[in-house]
Design a protein with these regions (language model features):
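N-terminal glycine-rich phosphate-binding loop for ADP-containing cofactors
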Residues: 1-213, 221-224, 274, 278, ...
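Conserved CoA-thioester-binding segment of acyl-CoA-metabolizing enzymes
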Residues: 198-260, 277, 281, 288, ...
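Glycine-rich beta-to-alpha active-site loop
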Residues: 293-341, 373-374
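Well-ordered beta-strand positions
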Residues: 325, 364, 368-370, 376, ...
Length: 515
């Protein structure tokens, strides 16, 4: 019930046991407290500690400024509460108690001492790593939810386990072991000790398989990044789906995203890095593997339902289209923005879309990059069902139980809304070259001229490749049609427009060169 409430209110939930501090406060409060111990020990001043904290954890305020904003009494009482149940390590430092008793805010002025930066970072990281790994030992929650709590709840750039992987397990172990020399009653948590002996990074899962009665749920859990697809996420998706497909206790698989998005596309940073570092083969392998994962979902013997709530852009919409059925809430918004950033859909979007709603409307959506809400997608046959957020779970369960969860994609011409009845013939084969050459820019028809202006702002080469791929694959078997997207992948990512478009995301509308 609590998880459902979180979904209905657009909140990101994590599952924890009823434990002191739950998950986030369990390591956040000691992080604040350790900052005051560093000050008390004379290792560094407040500006130095705040600077290190901001840089190390990717945040806008250090612990002292944060305590000034949220209240020093809250920090002190939180430490006392945890200490009463967990021991002296959590007790407020003498310096924190003194500041509380003074009734004054922490003084934030002073010069940063560069010589103390490393030791401060080691102490802060050691405290967080120690408590985070002890949460695993106590079974309070898992590392994915701990990291998620840090990123969503505290706005840290990375969660504790991601940071441990970044600095290295050996370094993390040393930071904790050094910190605990001052606490002889404590030992390095067993999970960190074991990971140190293995000498491998933490296996943080961004896609989880959860058995829910006779339903299997594959949940993309990277809400801090809108569940964007990258190499790791796609690998985890593959593994989680294979687990779901082989679970004989379930009759259907639900694909869903945690947080406010289904999947908001692919991780743009990966594409940019591949282009700049001349690693187009890595980009090709990623896309090829992604296609194979979506093909396995498409070809699964089990019923697969994509539960779409929030954004489904690019690769996210392509993932949803690989399911047998798409069930959305009115909050769902979907589209293919790729031609507006210099590329084209590469995970089957050109092929599955054209098969479901026809070439003409597929080209319209891909050429324009238009984002459409769930009700519009339903009206043109791109999604199968739309239910209110408070009904969708029960509707999915009842339709599956009654054997009535069946695809309803595609629409006859006369069933389309008036706007799309007009759009569809405009994107017939004989008119495509005129769209690509900008001949409709001066049209007297307002809809045609407006659409032409939108298309004129897209990457010309991406538009032509998309058109070519849709046409070439339309009469092929789907598996062969999807591979048409791979045939031109290195070519499109080698264009100047691809780099211009991909690096423009979040910075304004790109100006393409057509080369």
């Amino acid at each position: 019930a609590c998880r459902r409430f979180a979904q209905l209110t657009g909140k990101t939930d994590i599952l924890v046991k009823d434990a002191p501090g739950f998950a986030v406060n369990r390591f956040f409060v000691p992080w604040l407290n350790e900052a005051t111990r560093i000050l008390e020990a004379g290792i560094a001043n407040i500006p130095t500690i705040d600077k290190v904290a901001m840089e190390t954890f990717g945040i806008g305020m250090g612990p002292f400024k944060l305590m000034n904003v949220t209240g020093i009494p809250i920090a002190k009482h939180s430490c006392e509460s945890l200490a009463g149940k967990l021991g002296a390590f959590y007790a407020p430092s003498a310096r924190l108690k003194a500041q509380f008793e003074s009734g004054e805010l922490w003084p934030l002025v002073g010069e940063v001492d560069d010589a103390a930066l490393e030791e401060v970072a080691d102490r802060l990281l050691g405290a967080v790593f120690c408590v985070a790994t002890s949460l695993l030992e106590k079974g309070v929650t898992d590392m994915t939810d701990i990291d998620l709590g840090a990123k969503v709840g505290l706005r840290w750039r990375k969660g504790p386990f991601e940071v441990m992987n970044r600095v290295g397990i050996d370094t993390a172990y040393a930071q904790v072991a050094t910190l605990l020399k001052d606490w002889p009653d404590l030992t390095v948590p067993v999970h960190l000790e074991n990971q140190h002996k293995k000498g491998v990074p933490w296996d943080i899962r961004y896609v989880k398989y959860v058995q829910d009665g006779d339903l299997g749920r594959v949940v993309l859990s990277r809400p801090d990044a809108m569940n964007a697809l990258n190499e790791t996420v796609v690998k985890h998706l593959d593994e989680a789906f294979q687990e779901a497909a082989s679970d004989h206790q379930t009759q259907a698989v639900i694909l869903e995203g945690a947080g406010k998005a289904f999947v908001a596309g692919a991780d743009i940073g990966f594409f940019v890095k591949c282009i700049r570092e001349g690693r187009l083969d890595d980009n090709f392998k990623f896309t090829e593997y992604g296609q194979s994962v979506l093909n396995r979902i498409d070809e699964s013997q089990k019923l697969v339902v994509a539960k779409m709530d929030g954004l489904a852009l690019g690769g996210g919409l392509e993932l949803a289209l690989s399911a047998d059925v798409i069930v959305a809430t009115p909050k769902a918004v979907m589209g293919f923005p790729e031609t507006g950033i210099g590329i084209y859909p590469g995970l089957g979007g050109t092929q599955r879309t054209s098969r479901y709603i026809g070439k003409a409307l597929a080209k319209y959506l891909i050429f324009t990059g238009r984002l459409i809400p769930a009700e519009v997608a339903l009206s043109i046959g791109l999604v199968d069902y739309v239910f209110a957020p408070d009904e969708i779970e029960n509707k999915i369960r009842s339709l599956i139980a009654d054997g009535k969860m069946v695809p309803k994609k595609g629409r006859k011409d006369e069933e389309l809304p008036p706007e799309f009845q007009k759009i569809k013939p405009l994107f017939a084969d004989e008119n495509i070259e005129a769209w690509l050459n900008g001949k409709y820019l001066d049209s007297e028809d307002a809809l045609t001229a407006r659409t032409a202006k939108i298309i004129a702002g897209k990457a010309p080469l991406a538009l032509r490749f998309a058109n070519q791929i849709i046409d070439a694959g339309y009469e092929m078997a789907l598996s062969n049609g999807v591979r048409q997207e791979l045939a031109h992948l290195n070519e499109i990512f080698s264009t100047a427009d691809a780099l211009i478009g991909l690096t423009s995301v979040g910075k304004g509308r790109p100006v393409f060169q057509g080369k």
